[in-house]
Amino acid sequence: MKIAILNDTHAGIRNSSEIFINYQERFYDEVFFPYLLENDIKQILHLGDYYDNRKFINFKALNRNRHHFLSKLREYGISMDIIPGNHDTFYKNTNDLNSLKELLGHYMNEVHIVMEPKVVTYDDLDVALIPWICAENYQKTMNFIKECKAPVCGAHLELAGFEVARGQACHDGMDHKIFNKFELVLSGHFHCASQRDNIRYLGSQMEFFWSDADDPKYFHVLDSSTREVTAVKNPLRLFERIKYDDTKNEYFDYDVTQLKNKFVKVVVANKTDPFTFDRLIDRIQNEDVHELKIQENFSEFIGENVVDENISLEDTATLLDTYVEAVDTELDKKKIKSQMRELMREAQALEIS
């Protein structure tokens, strides 16, 4: 038996922007469901964060998600097991009130919501499913892990030391050794894929922020017989970063058609010919891009008046961490950084409407 695995699909992300709703629809219509139909896959396992906003969801996003995802489950005879992620729960200390139970009730024949840690059997493979761990279910989850005999675990975990985004590690969270007893742990939550020991963060299947640019996205298929996990690439890109250096590259014949309906950032390393640069920018703007940002190289301004010459001007998270480190306080700086990053993510989610 083969099980398609999704996680962190975030319906309604970026303030329920039409851009992201259309992008998600393309993924399901052009990539995900065609693969499932071609390979006769009838089971989905969703590892949390089905919805994006833990407080509310836009009716437009809800309607579109029903049409391009939930109705397809019924149409194609596909079942889905799902655990709540932190974005699916209203409160941070309990999973009891969550969007999955409130909004997916019409599809209970197709969607099975797993609210408590439990073992689900897919043919001959037992998989331990662990919802988002919070204060209320922590001890119950620890007891479940201690007694569990399943070789594979599917969860929505926040583990210390793993990458939240490329080059940005989670400074707090649980010790991953708690899950040492499992042969394989598949987790959602962090949007970039990574692996250490028996822990495999699958990463998001789609691009939602600039941190996702140049970070390949996949959905996954678990074979219950072999326990092999196959990554299936999502070829649809939404963010495109161009590193401009006219001392090394020619741009007169640069294919700008690939940039249509994308967010584009031109990072200028060297610009010796302003005419060539301006012509490229004009051509990009004529392609109906969602947004064009130009990031100039300000290295000439970095000198003795700047304390840290290694700060990346495009990495907001690094700037926030650097600022917190420079503050003279007895408060827990790891917690402050975590809160700052959470506020940054919430601000990014509200950026586009």
List each model region and its residues.
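Conserved catalytic scaffold of divalent metal-dependent phosphoesterases
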Residues: D88-K177
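Core catalytic region of metal-dependent phosphoesterases/phosphodiesterases
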Residues: K2, T9, I13-V119, I178-F182
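Structural motif
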Residues: K2-I3, Q43, L125-D126, V152, ...
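Active-site environment of divalent metal-dependent phosphoester hydrolases
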Residues: H10-R14, D52-K55, D81-T94, V120, ...
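Conserved beta-sheet core of the metallophosphoesterase superfamily
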Residues: A165-T230
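Divalent metal-coordination and catalytic microenvironments
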Residues: D8, Y28, I44, D49, ...
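Accessory, non-catalytic peripheral segments of nucleic-acid enzymes
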Residues: S224-S353
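Short, conserved loop/helix-junction motifs that constitute active-site signature segments
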Residues: L73-Y76, F144-C148, H176-K181, T257-K260
